[in-house]
Amino acid sequence: MKNTQKVALVVGAQGVIGRGLVDHLLTLDEWEVTCLSRRGGTDASAGSMFEGRLRHIAVDLLDPEDTHRKLSGLREVTHIFYAAYQDRPTWAELVPPNLAMLVNVVEAVEPIAPHLCHISLMQGYKVYGAHLGPFKTPARESDPNHMPPEFNIDQQNFLEARQRGKNWTWSAIRPSVVGGFALGNPMNLTMVIAVYASISKELGLPLRFPGKPGAYDKLMEMTDAGLLAKATVWAATDERCSNQAFNITNGDLFRWNDMWPKLARWFELEVAPPLPMSLEVIMADKEPLWNAMMAKYGLKYNYKEVSSWVFGDFVFSWDYDMFGDGSKARRFGFHEFIDTEEMFFRIFGNFRERRVIP
């Protein structure tokens, strides 16, 4: 390995955050990238622009033996970008698998990677209790922890304890709701809106906001996956960011009562008054319709791959303000921002180009 070469291990590389990280790292010539996921992927082929720089490993991170066996050759890793997630029905049930996966990765790689410089941990606003109900806004990185269970906090505590006396450092990245491209992902709001709008259009219906009445008027923010990737790599490579947490957001706020009509216009839909309804319930019978739409419009992805209804219900239930203070990242040197409206339109266009939606 050249002294100037950086070797990234992206954990959870098929998710909306992991995909963004991989895409960004491959634009930077000094990086080689190894991707971990349950499904694996296709390595860069000979003669391609990423030849020798991209490879995939399919691994069950909940299995310590499989993790150690599959990762035993990763001796040149310099940076671990951890963005894996396992969904569970309750907050308490989220803790054991999500903590175990991080522990298994670190315990497999750290002892064999002498050049390890940094471990980046992807978190979120659950650290602030945002999922539990109205919380202090803007949320700041210095805010105190809340009553457990909370796997994000347990993961950070593990890294802090593991890092003491070591040469490597860590960072904790805290985005808001992330917008980007990923299939079969349980937390993809842009996919929720795109598929919901496409089905509404196919049925000749206006686009109704389906969340709680109070959620339509509250302040909200999002984080573009590309912006998040840039910030994550910045924090992992800037010494000023060692052992720090950062809120990372697009930099603007919005309310659904202003954004929703703009999204409807992109899909050439009228807007009707909000109507509280569970997407998980009302979209449960729409698979036959989606199959017909796949045939009609030449769409490439089945209903299961594009469905994130439970997460949509979760986000649209926030009848309280949901935003953090992003000034710490700016004070430390990260100044990029993205207009959230433009982010939505770009991602929807990307879905259309890839034949995810009509």
Q: Model-flagged regions — what are they?
A:
Residues 29-42:
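Conserved glycine-rich Rossmann-like NAD(P)H-binding loop of the short-chain dehydrogenase/reductase
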Residues 55-77:
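Conserved Rossmann-fold cofactor-binding substructure of NAD(P)-dependent oxidoreductases
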Residues 78-82, 86, 92-151, 171:
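Conserved Rossmann-fold NAD(P)-dependent oxidoreductase catalytic core, especially the SDR/UDP-sugar
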Residues 145-176, 181:
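Active-site Tyr-X1-5-Lys
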Residues 166, 178-196, 226, 235-246:
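Glycine/proline-rich active-site loop of Rossmann-fold NAD(P)-dependent oxidoreductases
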Residues 195-223:
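A conserved pocket-lining segment of Rossmann-fold NAD(P)-dependent short-chain dehydrogenase/reductase
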Residues 229-312, 325-327, 331, 348-355:
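Mid/C-terminal beta-alpha module of Rossmann-like enzyme folds, strongest
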